[in-house]
């Protein structure tokens, strides 16, 4: 059976459009690492675990132009056709995978082929890419001896500890029937709690910690066969992570199979991928339409910043119907809102990048289990974290791009999509509510509506019975569809 080595703890007033209000001082995030006003997480590329693309094709560009597209393993419709270990197939069944997703149809034959080839793939969360690279890693590790079971053979790099822990969960479930599989984590933690040697078959971690553990000989990399870099675009958006990944790779065997996934491929990501995974097969998604199913998008007018807080408190009873996430721009906002709500007798928790790593794990585990119902967070949670019980997302601060020297405030469309994608998961109904308190925020909301060719419904806060009625009806509906038009 697979085992995980616990290496490191792992409102009020009329429509804003009918009045002119003086813009508040913008709460733009600060970039220095330790400032309390820091906005956690980079601007997230497009995607989210339940953001489905019902109409997209996967385009394949082979590094070997002589490869035969008619080969039966060029694309597969069933996992059984891949010649997988029956124990891995059993793990896939335990995860309720019945047939490959579109990205898996094309990625898996390329990943599993021998001799191993590098792969660069464009894939958003929710398309099955995590399962694809985990399946490849599980298929390539040698568990025949106790020594090999304790020797790192596959390394998966993620931009955040939360995402790393989530990937560990996928490895644990998919590999649960593989005797001798040991999963190790290499994420930020108290250096005194590190083991003398990382003994595992598959290691999952963040770039800086992995690099440090290799240099200290805690992780011995000379038997590694597979290197996965997940969410490359997010890595490059966060200062230093892309360079750290390059330095990690330089410490690994030259013949290692390199797998890189990214939600978007602007020029700088494409150039990075070509350097990080040379001569790779490439998969790209050809989007026809992007649909968010099961999410009702609303907005509330607030007269000022204080009114935003009062509106949030007024909503508290609805926030606890299921689980809710409140997104704010800075760590300071998260801390202040938590303190005020707790002082007033409300049960909430906050999670930001400035919180001790062990405490962060405790908070998110409580939120996953339902022990904590309301979570206040920055963009640290806007990307890739799956919590199935979330029924409501509050954009307390509309997500915006940090553009030094540019006076106009610009909405961050990709982070907005990621945030609201935390709700309405796995076929459930969800609600997203954005707070608007000044003309600049109103302009950013309109930017979002125009960009996605969608209408975000205004709810009049003069009548809280109506507000509650609308939200409760939405949550109780079997489905609440909201579609974004063609891009």
Swiss-Prot record:
Residues 28-38 have a biased composition (Polar residues). ATP binds at residues 123-130. Its EC number is 3.6.4.13. Its main location: cytoplasm. A motif (DEAD box) lies at residues 230-233. Residues 110-283 form the Helicase ATP-binding domain. It is found in: Cytoplasm; Nucleus, Nuclear pore complex; Nucleus membrane. Keywords: ATP-binding, Cytoplasm, Helicase, Hydrolase, Membrane, mRNA transport, Nuclear pore complex, Nucleotide-binding, Nucleus, Protein transport, RNA-binding, Translocation, Transport. One of its GO terms (cellular component) is nuclear pore cytoplasmic filaments. A motif (Q motif) lies at residues 77-105. One of its GO terms (biological process) is tRNA export from nucleus. It is a peripheral membrane protein. It catalyses: ATP + H2O = ADP + phosphate + H(+). Disulfide bonds: none annotated. Residues 311-467 form the Helicase C-terminal domain. It holds the Pfam family Helicase_C. Belongs to the DEAD box helicase family. DDX19/DBP5 subfamily. This is ATP-dependent RNA helicase dbp5. It comes from Aspergillus clavatus (strain ATCC 1007 / CBS 513.65 / DSM 816 / NCTC 3887 / NRRL 1 / QM 1276 / 107). The lineage of its organism: Eukaryota, Fungi, Dikarya, Ascomycota, Pezizomycotina. The gene is dbp5.
